[in-house]
Design a protein with these regions (language model features):
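N-terminal intrinsically disordered, cationic/polar leader segments
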Residues: 1-127
Length: 127
């Protein structure tokens, strides 16, 4: 387990100051087959112009032993606020880090980012 993931000993959930911890926390799967988490609070900046990009993120996975804790996901997604990233690269990074936290093969995690229109163009990247 990396330093950006935790299992069961929650840091983010119910603790003041937890917004400084940007890791993904997990808990034992209670028996669900598919989990879908959707957030419209993901932001990053264009690595070229520095302009803000706003996203709707959908993360779907088929859990085995572990599930993602939602507050830790919210805080994790907020860490990208100041990061320069293209939509496509961000989708891959999130997929890979979620898969690692859940101890799943990357093929068991699907991430779709819909970048809100800027310049009249909407971008959707899925992995």
């Amino acid at each position: 387990m990396t330093e950006t993931t935790r299992e069961t000993e929650f840091v983010a959930l119910g603790h003041a100051g937890s917004e400084h911890y940007a890791g993904l926390e997990t808990f034992p799967n209670p028996g669900v087959e598919v989990v879908e988490m959707v957030s419209d609070e993901l932001t990053a900046v264009c690595p070229i112009t520095g302009q803000p990009d706003f996203y709707e993120a959908t993360i779907e996975y088929r859990p085995q032993a572990l599930c993602l804790e939602s507050k830790s996901l919210k805080i994790y997604l907020s860490r990208f606020r100041e990061q320069g990233a293209f939509c496509e690269a961000l989708a891959v990074q999130i997929r890979d880090e979620v898969a690692e936290a859940l101890r799943l093969d990357r093929s068991a995690v699907h991430v779709t980012l819909v970048q809100k229109p800027r310049g009249g163009i909407t971008i959707t990247a899925s992995v």
